[in-house]
Every structure is written in structure tokens, then in C-alpha cells.
Amino acid sequence: MAMVLSAIIGSLVLALSGCSDQSGKTEKTLRVGVITYSQDDPFINALTDELKAYLKTMESEERRIIVSIKSGNDDQQEQNEKVEEMIDAGCDVLCVNLVDRTAPYRIIRMARNENIPVIFFNREPVKE
């Protein structure tokens, strides 16, 4: 799971870094927002630590990667608010581990309105 998520994020990093104006020595900053369902899950904590470490290896002189990790604390409404905070903070990509697998619609709508890619991991969205 960590390798798949890392590969997807890596692809997005490369794709999004191609979107910047690279005239001169301008450093591109890529902001990755990771929102988990709970901060009490050891597997999710290990996964997010691995993702953060992997993204650190992808940094270069031209590309800086900032990873912000927040928890929904087992509450879908709180997770939606955290996603909105990440969008307002300027995240370029969101990685979401849903609290409620049947409630991804608000997150998708918020991200789509800002043209931000969303990766759902470990908990696949499902219909009610």
C-alpha cells in the first residue's frame, strides 16, 4: 500500500513540477496535504511517516515538497473541515484516508472546484 501511494504521489510530483515557470533559479514548492481518519491507527501512522520520508527524497534544488498531515479524529465533518483548511492553505494535491467511506462527495466537490487532485487511500469510497 505504501509503495503504491508513494508511486502515485511521485507521479503527481513530477507532473505538477512541470507546470511551473522554471525561468531562472526559481524554486517550485509542492504542497501535499494528507488527511487521515484517525491519529490512533498505527498502520496509518506508519504509512504517512513512510510517505513523508519518500517525498523528502524527491526534493531537489528546484523542487521543495511540504507535507502537512492532519487527522479527522474519527469524525467525517471534522475531516471535511481539515480538507477545506488544506485547500485554503494552498495544497497542490490531497491524500485522504476517509472517516466514512460513503461520504467522499463534499471532499471531491471542494477539490474539484479548486482543480486539486485527490487520492483516496486505504479506504475506498463506496456508494451508500
Each predicted region: which residue ranges?
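Short, low-complexity disordered leader/linker segments with a strong preference
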Residues: 1-30, 87, 109-116
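A generic local structural motif
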Residues: 19, 80-81, 106
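Flexible loop/hinge segments that line or gate small-molecule binding clefts
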Residues: 101-128
